[in-house]
Structures are given as C-alpha cells and as structure tokens.
Amino acid sequence: MKPIVSILLFCALAVVIVGRRRSTGRGIPYVDEKLPNGQRCKPPGFDCSKSEECCGPQDTKNYAHGCAPQWSGMWNKRVNECYICYIESSSC
C-alpha cells in the first residue's frame, strides 16, 4: 500500500511542476518598436512564431526575451508566446 501511495504522490507532484505555466513577463516594461515588415512588435503573452516578432525589454542587461511554447488552457495545447524574463531567475 505504501509504494502505491508514494507513486501517486510522485505523479501528482510531477504534474504540478511540469504543467505549471511559465510567467510571460507581462508587468515588465518593454520597448514597443516597429518591425522591418511595418508591423509593431508583439508584447509578452501574445502569440508568435519567432523571437524577432517579440518586443524586447527596456533593461536588456537584466532581462531576456524570446518566443517559446507555453501551455494554453484555452486551446488545451502548447502555443508559442512572447516572453520577457529576469536572466538570473531559474525560469529564464
């Protein structure tokens, strides 16, 4: 009985850790610029296909940005979203 309970707890913990949505950096100031194709860059949390479409942070020394897969509960699958994160954090 104990091994079964241990396995169930491990599985539940793994689902919580792996399934956690990463912060996209919505509150971090970013540079809203015009891209070479004439469109505006996409802010954190918006859908993207490549990193060049995403707005960069104002503080480029401490923050990084890009386009990465995020879990979407609305679509029930992974979608690419722009993000900005603190370089020294473990989630970046």
From Swiss-Prot:
Any Pfam family matching the protein: Cys_Knot_tox
UniProt keyword annotation of Secreted present: yes
Compartments, record wording: Secreted
Keywords recorded for this protein, A-Z: Disulfide bond, Ion channel impairing toxin, Knottin, Neurotoxin, Secreted, Signal, Toxin
GO molecular function: ion channel regulator activity; toxin activity
Annotated signal peptide: 1-19
Expressing tissues: Expressed by the venom gland.
GO cellular component: extracellular region
Primary localization class, coarse: secreted
Cysteine disulfide partners in this protein: 41-55, 41-82, 54-67, 85-92
Family as reported in the entry's similarity comment: Belongs to the neurotoxin 27 (Jztx-72) family. ICK-41 subfamily.
Function: Probable neurotoxin with ion channel impairing activity.
Annotated domain remarks: The presence of a 'disulfide through disulfide knot' structurally defines this protein as a knottin.
Protein name stated in the entry: Toxin ICK-14
